[in-house]
């Protein structure tokens, strides 16, 4: 019994290895679980839903169809899923509202699917939506009556969220609320009473009642025209008469409320600074999580820095909208902004820093990312070069007089001994009071690393930027309480249709396995199988053909390979430059600069180090030859390398290409389907190519059986370590240097590189060989 259980466990762990992200090794500690309110685990109650005779869910009794249902754009299922008609004339009024209150599940061309979750409703309240607003507008937009279970779920999740705020004013912390009864309820708790600041005589300080005037720190531009974002603006205007009056007037009212200067009466009490963490934990336990807001305009303790946006920096409508969610009430809210790769996340970060105008810390996940952030600050803002300091293993600028510091997660989270110079910089970083911390590629960092980084540096406001808020584990939800709720998420197809990102043709190229390679693939059970389907000669030929085809069109091509053995083999045989983990920073920058500006260098090979933070706007073709199992995030990040809008291209035509080369009848095909899920949900479609036209006419490598046999021998001679994925040193979530792996007896005897080969001797050769043998040895042959 025990042996069977063990084998089952091993099978499961082997399966998970490929599906999980690189960072999944870290286990969330018990302490991180404390910071999640009980309401976050609640689900929509579906117990009242009946099934019809065919086993399908029957919603007819719970949801009554409205008379004017054809002019309403959506319906809400009792399980919390919301279905929106993208072709409806009312689409533009519903799109922004649904993004604010729910999580996008799938957004193809004609119908979009969203899901109400506790976290999405928490985010909605945090950006200013009230419980009554959410329910009322949902009822106005719905084709049917909204199920009672959904109304109860919305009330349950939003009744206490957003009611209490932790505000920093004049370097003093206050718990603030517009609801006096909530403040009184909190003060009845003994732990919170202990956190309250007392006067010199030991008496509690008085409650402060004041009227706050708030207005968005980001004003609307003329090009936005005050309307919601839409992929079909003309349709909405043309069909304006079909919009029901109640939907139109209610949207206008909500939009007006968001932009108008508001006066709110608040009640607050001051908190002892050393008790902040204790207070936050206790408020979460009482189901009143504190929203962190930074009143940066009234912060007189931290000096303003001399930094503004350049006149040439023009924000696009969706960038403005995301920033208005962050600065909606004149204060800076902490949270996450989700924009596609190439849609200008860096400009959003720089604009946020210029709006706050306090000391800013930027964290990326590689030294290349640090250099690019520095270039972005110099490009979009008026900041002086001397005010920017970098802190990486290669570049440690002196932090004296620095206003913007740029570093990596691994540099700040480093726990072992540092050099004297690095220790001094770290002490300086810890001593600073940062106004804003920008966390780039925020999805890649495990919870433990976050806690380490966020406890090392003190920041009033945290802004997370990412293109893919997905992970194969459930750790993505930790971002809600470690940083803040999701403030804004853009629609990829909408940005593509408006020309803000490239129009990409996605294709999956099926490469048949050669008979010799497939025979070995079926026989071998170790990780060397990965090498066999990656080094498949037909895949190599397809890659070579696509490179030649696109180079003739003067395209810029990036080839991605997670496996270093395959990366080197492909690049060296095709005589192309390649970048992987051990490549020095200087060599990387030289290769990337040549790729950008040298017309003779049109193709580069990159390992997984280029998945994120490599800014290559010139690239318009991406070929993927090997990948990290079934990781949806990696597929989307790689597509992002070619998503940047192309200059001088016609928007109606495809102007970027994404090829994923897959060996047929292997495990790679299953992984490929899993990887595409996120992009398919965003509205992309993958074209399957089984035969590349014109490939037979080309003179390609490995066209003969002998060449293929030699390649097979080289692959079989490789060790199991060559089949391992690349471990990127210094990268957050990198796997340890040792690992258990299945081996063979030949490995134990040191015969890993030895090959057994049979040769057929021609007939009569024995006799001819015998003639040349010395008579002395002939006696021993008898």
From Swiss-Prot:
CDD domains, alphabetized: DEXHc_XPB (cd18029), SF2_C_XPB (cd18789)
Motif (DEVH box): 440-443
Biased amino acid composition, Acidic residues: 19-28
Entry GO terms, CC: nucleotide-excision repair factor 3 complex; transcription factor TFIIH holo complex; transcription preinitiation complex
InterPro entries assigned: ATP-dep_DNA_Helicase (IPR050615), ERCC3_RAD25_C (IPR032438), Helicase/UvrB_N (IPR006935), Helicase_ATP-bd (IPR014001), Helicase_C-like (IPR001650), P-loop_NTPase (IPR027417), XPB/Ssl2 (IPR001161), XPB/Ssl2_N (IPR032830)
Record domain Helicase C-terminal: where: 541-701
Biased composition, class Polar residues, residue ranges: 224-242
Keyword terms, alphabetized: ATP-binding, DNA damage, DNA repair, DNA-binding, Helicase, Hydrolase, Isomerase, Nucleotide-binding, Nucleus, Transcription, Transcription regulation
GO molecular function annotation: 3'-5' DNA helicase activity; ATP binding; ATP hydrolysis activity; DNA binding
Biased composition (Basic and acidic residues): 1-11
Residue numbers covered by motif Nuclear localization signal: 6-17
Gene3D superfamilies with a match to the protein in the record: P-loop containing nucleotide triphosphate hydrolases
Primary localisation category: nucleus
Pfam families: ERCC3_RAD25_C (PF16203), Helicase_C_3 (PF13625), ResIII (PF04851)
Catalytic activity: Couples ATP hydrolysis with the unwinding of duplex DNA by translocating in the 3'-5' direction; ATP + H2O = ADP + phosphate + H(+)
Record field: compositional bias (Low complexity): 211-223
Recorded family membership: Belongs to the helicase family. RAD25/XPB subfamily.
Quaternary assembly: Component of the 7-subunit TFIIH core complex composed of XPB/ERCC3, XPD/ERCC2, GTF2H1, GTF2H2, GTF2H3, GTF2H4 and GTF2H5, which is active in NER. The core complex associates with the 3-subunit CDK-activating kinase (CAK) module composed of CCNH/cyclin H, CDK7 and MNAT1 to form the 10-subunit holoenzyme (holo-TFIIH) active in transcription. Interacts with PUF60. Interacts with ATF7IP. Interacts with Epstein-Barr virus EBNA2.
Role this protein plays: ATP-dependent 3'-5' DNA helicase/translocase; binds dsDNA rather than ssDNA, unzipping it in a translocase rather than classical helicase activity. Component of the general transcription and DNA repair factor IIH (TFIIH) core complex. When complexed to CDK-activating kinase (CAK), involved in RNA transcription by RNA polymerase II. The ATPase activity of XPB/ERCC3, but not its helicase activity, is required for DNA opening; it may wrap around the damaged DNA wedging it open, causing localized melting and twisting that allows XPD/ERCC2 helicase to anchor.
Protein's UniProt name: General transcription and DNA repair factor IIH helicase/translocase subunit XPB
């Amino acid at each position: 019994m025990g042996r069977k259980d063990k084998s089952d466990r091993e099978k499961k762990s082997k399966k998970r290895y490929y599906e999980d992200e690189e960072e999944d090794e870290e286990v969330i500690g018990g302490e991180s679980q404390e910071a999640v309110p009980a309401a976050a685990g609640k689900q929509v109650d579906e117990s009242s839903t009946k099934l019809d005779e065919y086993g399908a869910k029957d919603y007819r009794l719970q949801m009554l169809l409205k008379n004017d249902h054809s002019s309403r754009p959506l319906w809400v299922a009792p399980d919390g899923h919301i279905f929106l008609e993208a072709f409806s004339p009312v689409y533009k009024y519903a799109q922004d509202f649904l993004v604010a209150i729910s999580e996008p599940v799938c957004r193809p061309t004609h119908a979009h699917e969203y899901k109400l979750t506790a976290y999405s409703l928490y985010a909605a309240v945090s950006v200013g939506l009230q419980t009554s607003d959410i329910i009322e507008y949902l009822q106005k937009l719905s084709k049917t009556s909204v199920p009672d279970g959904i109304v109860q779920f919305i009330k349950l999740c939003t009744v206490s969220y957003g009611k209490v705020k932790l505000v920093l004013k004049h370097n003093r912390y206050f718990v603030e609320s517009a609801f006096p009864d909530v403040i009184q309820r909190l003060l009845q708790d003994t732990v919170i009473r202990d956190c309250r600041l007392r006067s010199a005589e030991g008496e509690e300080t008085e409650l402060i009642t004041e009227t706050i005037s708030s207005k968005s720190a980001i004003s609307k531009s003329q090009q936005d025209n005050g309307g919601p974002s839409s992929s079909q603006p003309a349709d909405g205007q043309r069909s304006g008469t079909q919009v029901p009056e109640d939907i139109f007037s209610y949207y206008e009212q909500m939009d007006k409320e968001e932009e108008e200067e508001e006066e709110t009466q608040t009640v607050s009490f001051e908190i002892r600074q050393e008790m902040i963490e204790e207070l936050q934990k206790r408020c979460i336990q009482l189901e009143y999580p504190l929203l962190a807001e930074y009143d940066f305009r009234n912060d007189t303790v931290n000096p303003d820095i001399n930094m503004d946006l350049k006149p040439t920096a023009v924000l696009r409508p969706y960038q403005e909208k995301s920033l208005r969610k962050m600065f909606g009430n004149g204060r800076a809210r902490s949270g996450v902004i989700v924009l596609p790769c190439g849609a200008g996340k860096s400009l959003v970060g720089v604009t946020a820093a210029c709006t706050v105008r306090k000391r800013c810390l930027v964290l990326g996940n590689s030294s290349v990312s640090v250099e690019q952030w520095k270039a972005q600050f110099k490009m979009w803002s008026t900041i002086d070069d001397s005010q920017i300091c970098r802190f990486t293993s290669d570049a440690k600028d002196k932090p004296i007089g620095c206003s913007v510091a740029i570093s990596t997660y691994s540099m700040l989270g480093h726990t072992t001994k540092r050099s004297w110079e690095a220790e001094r910089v770290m002490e300086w970083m810890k001593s600073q009071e940062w106004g804003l911390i920008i966390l780039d590629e925020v999805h890649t960092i495990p919870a433990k690393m976050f806690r380490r980084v966020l406890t090392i540096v003190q920041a009033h406001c945290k802004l997370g930027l990412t293109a893919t808020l997905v992970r194969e584990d459930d750790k993505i939800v930790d971002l809600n309480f470690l940083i803040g709720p999701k403030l804004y998420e853009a629609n990829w197809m909408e940005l593509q249709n408006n020309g803000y990102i490239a129009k990409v043709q996605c294709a999956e190229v099926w490469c048949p396995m050669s008979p010799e390679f497939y025979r070995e693939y079926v026989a071998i059970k170790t990780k060397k199988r990965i090498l066999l389907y990656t080094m498949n000669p037909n895949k190599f030929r397809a890659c070579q053909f696509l490179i030649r085809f696109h180079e003739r069109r003067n395209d810029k091509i990036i080839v991605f390979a997670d496996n270093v053995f395959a990366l080197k083999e492909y690049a060296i045989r095709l005589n192309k430059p390649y970048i992987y983990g051990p490549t020095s920073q200087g060599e990387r920058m030289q290769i990337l600069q040549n790729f950008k500006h040298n017309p003779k260098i049109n193709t580069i090979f990159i390992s997984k180090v280029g998945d994120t933070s490599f800014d290559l706007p010139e690239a318009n073709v991406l070929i993927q030859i090997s990948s990290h199992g079934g990781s949806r995030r990696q597929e989307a990040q790689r597509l992002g390398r070619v998503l940047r809008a192309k200059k001088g291209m016609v928007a109606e035509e495809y102007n970027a290409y994404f090829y994923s080369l897959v060996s047929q009848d292997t495990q790679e095909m299953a992984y490929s389907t899993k990887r595409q899920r996120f992009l398919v949900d965003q509205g992309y479609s993958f074209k399957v190519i089984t035969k590349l036209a014109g490939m037979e006419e080309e003179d390609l490598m490995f066209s003969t059986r002998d060449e293929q046999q030699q390649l097979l021998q080289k692959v079989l001679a490789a060790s199991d370590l060559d089949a391992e994925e690349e471990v990127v040193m210094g990268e957050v979530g990198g796997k340890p240097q040792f690992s258990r792996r299945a081996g063979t007896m030949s490995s134990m005897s040191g015969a890993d590189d030895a090959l057994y080969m049979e040769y057929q001797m021609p007939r009569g050769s024995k006799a001819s060989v015998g003639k040349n043998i010395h008579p002395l040895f002939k006696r021993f042959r008898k």
